[in-house]
Amino acid sequence: MIVKFCGFKTESDIKKIKKLEVDAVGFIHYPDSKRHVSLKQLKYLAKIVPDHIEKVVVVVNPQMSTIKRIINQTDINTIQLHGNESIQLIRNIKKLNSKIRIIKAIPATRNLNNNIQKYKDEIDMFIIDTPSITYGGTGQSFDWKLLKKIKGVDFLIAGGLDFEKIKRLEIYSFGQCGYDISTGIESHNEKDFNKMTRILKFLKGDE
C-alpha cells in the first residue's frame, strides 16, 4: 500500500517524517496554493528528505522552463501534474530526463475514464482527486462510486482523506494502490505527527 503525504512547507514538518514508513512526500510548486513553496524552498526541503522516500513536486499547467529548473536544480524524482497538461508536455519531460516518474492527477468527474484513457500510456501512476477550480487541496471528498469504473491502471485516492475516511475506503475493493493525504494529516496548518503515524500504522499492517 503506497502512502503519499503532501503539502510540506517547512523543515520542522520534514523532520517529523524522517523515521516514518511513508513512501512519498509532496511539495506544491503552484503560487495559487496555500501550500506553495518557491523553487529555493523546494531545493532545500527536497534535499533534507531521506533518500528512501520518493520526492514529488506538484505543478499545475507548468511551462517547460519551470520543469527544467526543477529537474536541474532540485533532488525531486517525481513530477505530479495537476492541471490540463498536454501529452506533448509529458513526452518532453521524459525526453529531458527519462528517469523522472510522472504522476497525473485526474478530477473525479463523469469524464474520469476518458481522461484516464488519454494519459494512461504516457504516465506512471494516477491520482484521483476532488474536482476543483483550485486544482486540489480542498479538503473535500468526492463520490467514491466513480472509482468502480477504473480498470487496469495504478492509482492513488486523494480528496479530503483522513484516518476515518481511509478506514472506510479500505472496506471497499476499488483497486487503489494507496492514498495521497494532505489536509487530513494537519493540525493548525502544520503536519501532525500523531495523525501521520496513526494512518501509517493502519495501512502498513501494524494496527
From Swiss-Prot:
Biochemical pathway: Amino-acid biosynthesis; L-tryptophan biosynthesis; L-tryptophan from chorismate: step 3/5
Alphabetically ordered keywords of this record: Amino-acid biosynthesis, Aromatic amino acid biosynthesis, Isomerase, Tryptophan biosynthesis
GO molecular function list: phosphoribosylanthranilate isomerase activity
UniProt key word NADP: no
EC numbers, comma separated: 5.3.1.24
GO biological process: L-tryptophan biosynthetic process
Catalysed reactions listed for this entry: N-(5-phospho-beta-D-ribosyl)anthranilate = 1-(2-carboxyphenylamino)-1-deoxy-D-ribulose 5-phosphate
Pfam family, one: PRAI
CDD domains named in the record: PRAI
Disulfides per UniProt: none
InterPro entries: Aldolase_TIM (IPR013785), PRAI_dom (IPR001240), RibuloseP-bd_barrel (IPR011060), TrpF_fam (IPR044643)
Homology family: Belongs to the TrpF family.
Listed PANTHER family: N-(5'-PHOSPHORIBOSYL)ANTHRANILATE ISOMERASE
Name of the protein described by the UniProt record: N-(5'-phosphoribosyl)anthranilate isomerase
Protein species of origin: Staphylococcus epidermidis (strain ATCC 35984 / DSM 28319 / BCRC 17069 / CCUG 31568 / BM 3577 / RP62A)
